[in-house]
Amino acid sequence: MDRRRMPLWALLLLWSPCTFSLPTGTTFERIPLKKMPSVREILEERGVDMTRLSAEWDVFTKRSSLTDLISPVVLTNYLNSQYYGEIGIGTPPQTFKVIFDTGSANLWVPSTKCSRLYLACGIHSLYESSDSSSYMENGDDFTIHYGSGRVKGFLSQDSVTVGGITVTQTFGEVTELPLIPFMLAQFDGVLGMGFPAQAVGGVTPVFDHILSQGVLKEKVFSVYYNRGPHLLGGEVVLGGSDPEHYQGDFHYVSLSKTDSWQITMKGVSVGSSTLLCEEGCEVVVDTGSSFISAPTSSLKLIMQALGAKEKRLHEYVVSCSQVPTLPDISFNLGGRAYTLSSTDYVLQYPNRRDKLCTVALHAMDIPPPTGPVWVLGATFIRKFYTEFDRHNNRIGFALAR
């Protein structure tokens, strides 16, 4: 296996925000997030036809495997991901930009042992085990399949620092990294914030290690995504929530499954008409996905009500001049309607010449027993500050400021 370092010139492409924490003695920690253009936005601006890429990458089933273990979970659509924070791995810490992903439970980053055949590795921060005094070898194979591609490597153990808290963690050193989307991605890896049952190979997730230390005020974490175009994209708070970023009280919805961030939705309305899910639909609240996703048949009903047209596979557009007149879309969660206006669920790309705007809802079809399931991603979380409560197995929503 090639153990040489990848070129350091690529590090010039990386951003380096400071990770900070609250003053000593407090019992929750903040991780600031940066907002960058998604891979999809970059490709759109360069005039790339997304039809083929959508067909290959908008596949919302992934098989996570360690040796012969395969477990289906909902796939985060990293092609559209925008929000990243920094963590440190090793002693002294090596810094990585990661997506905090409630749809998965493993931590992985690219390794210096990544083959030079995988060009995407050359533009990311790479973990070097020999530079860390706290590294411990594991060596078990690690593979995650994404549609037609895969992320592959092996497991290692080292110190991981998140928001000022350090734990000893087993994580994936990735040695095979697909060109798309990772060649253009602003993030290096993924930090799964899901449950132990979702983790590849029985690895204990990072947040569970943090909980075991007993340092947090509450067994919760919360996510805020800034709705503006600012580079300061939001924050993840471990152990609590930040009232500066939401108004009113949290409304909580109990998990429908105790091993994932999944709840039951009792209605989807467009304008004043309830079109779907009156008998109940399952929905995953996924911080790693940018869009709201629905089964194809359900999405078509919503798009018909909006008058949207399918431009390419699973992607719908409307005339930008039409946006102010589009109806609200509401999701009934725990007996309460959470409403998105057209400015919340329609994306406007200034550089597009066709004057079309993209509806931030995509099609997703997951077969039983995992599906069918909806996904509420950043399109929803930007409007509603979200708290993930492990102690009470529930998710809380409050209107974001």
From Swiss-Prot:
Cysteines engaged in disulfide bonds, as pairs: C114-C121, C277-C281, C320-C357
Prodomain residues: 26-63
Every Peptidase A1 domain range: 83-398
GO cellular component: extracellular space
Record's catalysed reaction(s): Cleavage of Leu-|-Xaa bond in angiotensinogen to generate angiotensin I
Entry keyword annotation includes Lipid biosynthesis: no
EC numbers for this chain: 3.4.23.15
UniProt-listed GO biological process terms: gene expression; positive regulation of blood pressure; proteolysis
Tissue: Submandibular gland.
Location (main, coarse): secreted
EC class: hydrolase
Record: active site: D101, D286
GO MF term set: aspartic-type endopeptidase activity; endopeptidase activity
Signal peptide region: 1-25
Keyword terms of this UniProt record: Aspartyl protease, Cleavage on pair of basic residues, Disulfide bond, Hydrolase, Protease, Secreted, Signal, Zymogen
CDD domains found in the cross-reference section: renin_like (cd05487)
One matching Pfam family: A1_Propeptide
Transmembrane segments: none
Function: Renin is a highly specific endopeptidase, related to pepsin, whose only known function is to generate angiotensin I from angiotensinogen in the plasma, initiating a cascade of reactions that produce an elevation of blood pressure and increased sodium retention by the kidney.
Similarity annotation: Belongs to the peptidase A1 family.
Miscellaneous comment: The active enzyme isolated from the submandibular gland has catalytic and antigenic activities similar to renal renin.
PANTHER family to which the protein is assigned, alphabetical: BETA-SITE APP-CLEAVING ENZYME, ISOFORM A-RELATED, RENIN
Subunit description: Dimer of a heavy chain and a light chain joined by a disulfide bond.
Name used for this protein in its record: Renin-2
Protein source organism: Mus musculus
Name of the gene this protein is made from: Ren2
